[in-house]
């Protein structure tokens, strides 16, 4: 009788171990690709569009659909060029690691509003939505990286705000580790059309200031772009593992 009980207990423990192992493997598989879809939006485009669109669903406030962005003070590279370079490298790195990806644009000659970009990613069923941008300031000494997400008071982003906040913080911290860039923190913005229309967990990263000569030169270099991509990927993976 005792031997039978021991045998049953051994079988139960073995079964429990198998279940725990399977759950861990499933979580690992999910975080390393398979079911994960990363949507990448290289900010801006070659020509801005000043036509107006709703800032948020049902909002009476309207904004220009999309701008062409800023330009490097030294390199003269346009923001829309830089964001696509980094976006394509990010896509390639993620694919190498087994993730599925969805690009909002792969060329400069498009006309896609910020609202349309968000809706595209909603329809795609993104796990995370990464919006890539670069910053500018009248003060050429200003430098560093920041991330933008909605506040907890935003009625349009309630379902994803908390997760988006975590994704933003994870991407920011890992970006700073990978690049050594100055950490300018998280900016909570409720006036961003692309954020307000998104039903996916999302963040907008301002990778650096194109108005700062040193940072402008850095961001166009292949080596620094690879570091930026490493930081973004590490941030995405940190979020996926801890969500």
Q: Whereabouts are the PLM-identified features?
A:
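Active-site histidine-acidic residue metal-binding/catalytic motifs
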Residues: 30-118, 151
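Active-site-adjacent substrate-binding region
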Residues: 160-187
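Mature extracellular/periplasmic domains of secretome proteins
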Residues: 114-127, 146, 192-198
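Solvent-exposed loop/turn segments at secondary-structure junctions
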Residues: 44-47, 79, 107-111, 134-139, ...
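Soluble non-cytosolic domains of exported or imported proteins
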Residues: 77-85, 108-115, 158-166, 219-227
């Amino acid at each position: 009788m005792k031997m039978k009980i021991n045998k049953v207990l051994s079988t139960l423990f073995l079964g429990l171990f198998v279940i725990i192992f399977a759950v861990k493997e499933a979580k690992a598989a999910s975080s390393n690709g398979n079911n994960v879809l990363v949507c990448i939006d290289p900010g801006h485009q070659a020509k801005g569009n000043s036509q107006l669109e709703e800032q948020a669903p049902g909002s009476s406030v309207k904004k220009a659909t999309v701008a062409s962005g800023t330009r490097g003070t030294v390199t003269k590279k346009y923001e829309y060029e830089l964001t696509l370079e980094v976006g394509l490298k990010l896509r390639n790195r993620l694919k190498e690691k087994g993730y599925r990806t969805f690009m909002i644009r792969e060329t400069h000659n498009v006309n896609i509003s910020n609202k349309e970009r968000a809706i595209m990613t909603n329809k795609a069923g993104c796990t995370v939505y990464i919006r890539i941008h670069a910053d500018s300031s009248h003060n050429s000494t200003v430098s560093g990286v920041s991330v933008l997400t909605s506040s907890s008071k935003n009625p349009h982003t309630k379902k994803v705000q908390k997760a988006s906040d975590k994704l933003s913080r994870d991407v920011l911290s890992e970006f700073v580790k990978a690049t050594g860039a100055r950490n300018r923190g998280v900016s909570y913005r409720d006036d961003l059309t692309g954020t307000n229309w998104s039903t996916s967990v999302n963040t907008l990263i301002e990778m650096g200031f194109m108005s700062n000569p040193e940072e402008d030169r850095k961001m166009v270099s292949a080596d620094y772009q690879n570091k930026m991509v490493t930081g973004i990927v590490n941030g995405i993976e940190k979020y996926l593992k801890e969500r």
